Each structure stands twice: as C-alpha cells, then as structure tokens.
A protein has these predicted regions:
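Structural preference for beta-rich elements and adjacent junctions enriched in aromatics
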Residues: 14-245
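Hydrophobic h-region of N-terminal signal peptides that target proteins for export
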Residues: 4-15
Length: 245
C-alpha cells in the first residue's frame, strides 16, 4: 500500500511539472479546404469563404496604436498537406532595412506564425517543440535552430503579399513538422493533417515605422504580466488551432 501511494505521489508530481498552457487561450476552428487556395496575395479563393476572421488585437510591445498606423486580422484553412493563412493588414509604413535575412529580422515589419504540432506547450527556444516562423517582406521565413542560431526555414513555407495604398493582403502556406525535426538532415517529412487535430497556434506582427528597432508587437493572444514578448520561447502562450471539416 505504501508503495502504491509513493507511485501515486510521483505521478501527481510529474503531471504538475508537465508543460501546459496559459489560462484563457483562444480556440480557432479552421475548416478544411476542398481545393487549396493559391498563395498569391490576392485572397479571392473560394477556400476562404468558410473561414472566420480573427483579429490581432493584443499589444505586447510599444505605445498605444492608432488604427491608421496598424490593423490586422487573419483566417485559416487547411488540407491534409499543410495549413494556409490569409491575412489583411493596414500599415502606413513598411520597413525592411536589414538586408541579411538572419540579422535582426524582428526589427523590420515582420509577420510571425507560431505552431506547436502536438499542442504540448512548453519551452521551444532552442528546440523544435514548436516553430516560430518570422516572415520577412522578402517572403523568407526565419526561426532559431537547435544550434541556437537563426536559420532559414523558407523551404517549409510559401509566402506572397500585395499592397494597395496602406492595405496589405498576405497569404502563406506552412508544412507542419513534429518536434523530432532535425536541422542536420534532409529527410524530415511533414505530418499529414486530419479533422480533429489540435495544434498550438498564434499569429503576431512586428511593426516598424522608421525606428532602429520595432515600435510595436501585436499578437492574437493575451499575454499576462510584464514579459509579454515570450512567444518565441514559451509555447504555453499559444492558442489552439482545431482542424474541422
């Protein structure tokens, strides 16, 4: 009996130490696309009609924003091969001053998409428990590798955007990989997606209107406390992406 209680205590302790998620995370139900949308920065495909818009409304860094300076929203659809995002932004000034895609990419205007394939939460700073794709205006996608250095993961994605005055339409598609992904091999294969699958998911935007560093960081999830810029480290901040028919 004492041995049983000891095992129970160990199990309870293990559960309490498992990585989790912050309270009050959002859930986005993404409908399956009968035909995949074209990733062309237009956003007029039928695949988008059933997907709901979700705002980027949580200011993680920077002072109060005027609506003329920035507005953002997104929607998501999927096929068994990958997920697709359609994003619409109002941004009066676009900045891309760091020509080396691996240098200070977060201080330019940058779209960020965070994905935790198995919805496990937890740390992903220097591992692939989750991916934090930083999409630059040149459509490259950067994250930090297991060697603790920025790497291009542009081969995981397709990205296109178009601008009309201050309005930007941005479309991306993303292959989904497990946390077994290895940077040192070329045999990684994306998972096959299915209705009912849950993933950790979050969208954010770095806005720079001409400063040396980004002036605002706006996300799709509420971040409590003083350290709001932690999505690149902690997948517990992510919301939930639920794939539905």
């Amino acid at each position: 009996m004492l041995a049983w209680f000891a095992l129970l205590a160990v199990a309870i302790t293990a559960r309490s130490e498992e990585p989790g998620h912050d309270a009050d995370r959002s859930i986005y139900k993404a409908p399956r696309a009968a035909e995949p949308p074209r990733v062309d920065g237009v956003g007029d495909d039928l695949a988008w009609d059933r997907a709901a818009w979700r705002e980027l409304k949580y200011r993680w860094l920077g002072p109060e924003l005027e609506s003329s300076d920035f507005q953002g929203r997104y929607k998501v659809t999927w096929t068994p091969e990958r997920i697709y995002l359609l994003l619409e932004f109002v941004d009066d000034i676009l900045i891309d001053t760091h020509r080396d895609p691996l240098q200070r990419y977060w201080d330019d205007d940058t779209l960020e998409v965070f994905i935790d394939e198995d919805h496990s939460g937890g740390n992903h700073q220097f591992n692939h428990n989750a991916f934090a794709y930083h999409f630059a205006l040149d459509n490259q996608a950067i994250d930090i590798g297991t060697d603790q250095r920025p790497r291009s993961y542009s081969h995981h994605v397709e990205s296109r955007w178009q601008q009309n005055a201050d309005n930007i339409v941005w479309e991306v598609s993303i292959d989904i990989y497990t946390d077994d992904y290895r940077d040192d091999v070329d045999t990684n294969r994306p998972v096959t997606l299915y209705a009912g699958k849950l993933m950790g998911f979050m969208v954010a935007y770095c806005d720079n209107d001409g400063s040396d560093i980004r002036e605002h960081f706006i996300g799709s999830e509420f971040a409590a406390g003083d350290h709001k810029d932690r999505g690149w480290i902690d997948a517990g901040l992510f919301g939930t992406l639920q794939l539905v028919e």
